[in-house]
């Protein structure tokens, strides 16, 4: 019974609301002037994709190959990452050392599905297939973003930080001003 009352009241409310909106007198005039009309809302268009062609896969592969190459010093790799500074060179060297020590080198790369980025239309996204020498982790796929820089391409800072943990890992090399570690006590003998 209660359900029927609710349905009836709900229907009556809807009918009343619709009926009242149609009951205004056609000759009724407002005493105040009509509200000024606002200009139509327009959304600002997204930045259009560049007119230049997308980079060739080889251009992106070259960036990644040089980053993973142990023969290229970290100071020469800084220019391969968006916003990297000379202070990041040591982290880049540690990354390459970790790849070598972990038996991941040599590495090869394949850049697929290259497209303009949805977030920054002047950047490109690519699905990169990384093939390593490591027997247990031979191949993996990772989406990477690249930034146009001085006629070439750089790995985006965000992608570099995810891959290299650059800027998030403390410097593991002792500084010149660090005191030498204390000798461990010798067991009584």
Curated annotation (Swiss-Prot):
A lipid is attached at residue 23 (N-palmitoyl cysteine). The keyword Cell membrane applies. Residues 180-189 have a biased composition (Pro residues). A lipid is attached at residue 23 (S-diacylglycerol cysteine). The gene is lppK. Residues 1-22 form the signal peptide. Belongs to the MTB12 family. It is a lipid-anchor. This is Putative lipoprotein LppK. It comes from Mycobacterium bovis (strain ATCC BAA-935 / AF2122/97). Keywords: Cell membrane, Lipoprotein, Membrane, Palmitate, Signal. GO terms for cellular component: plasma membrane. The keyword Transmembrane does not apply.
């Amino acid at each position: 019974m209660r359900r029927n009352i609710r349905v009836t009241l709900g229907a009556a409310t809807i009918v009343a609301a619709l009926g009242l909106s149609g009951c205004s007198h056609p000759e009724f005039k407002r005493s105040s002037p009509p509200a000024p009309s606002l200009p139509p809302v327009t959304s600002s268009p997204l930045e259009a994709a560049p007119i230049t062609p997308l980079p060739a896969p080889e251009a992106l592969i070259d960036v990644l190959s040089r980053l993973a190459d142990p023969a290229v010093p970290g100071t020469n790799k800084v220019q391969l990452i968006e916003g990297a500074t000379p202070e990041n060179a040591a982290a880049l060297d540690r990354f390459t050392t970790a790849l070598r020590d972990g038996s991941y080198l040599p590495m090869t790369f394949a850049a697929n599905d290259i497209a303009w980025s949805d977030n920054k239309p002047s950047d490109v996204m690519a699905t990169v297939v990384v093939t390593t020498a490591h027997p247990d982790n031979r191949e993996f796929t990772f989406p990477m973003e690249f930034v146009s820089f001085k006629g070439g391409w750089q790995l985006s800072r965000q992608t570099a930080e995810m891959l290299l943990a650059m800027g998030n890992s403390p410097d593991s090399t002792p500084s010149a001003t660090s005191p030498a570690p204390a000798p461990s006590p010798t067991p009584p003998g």
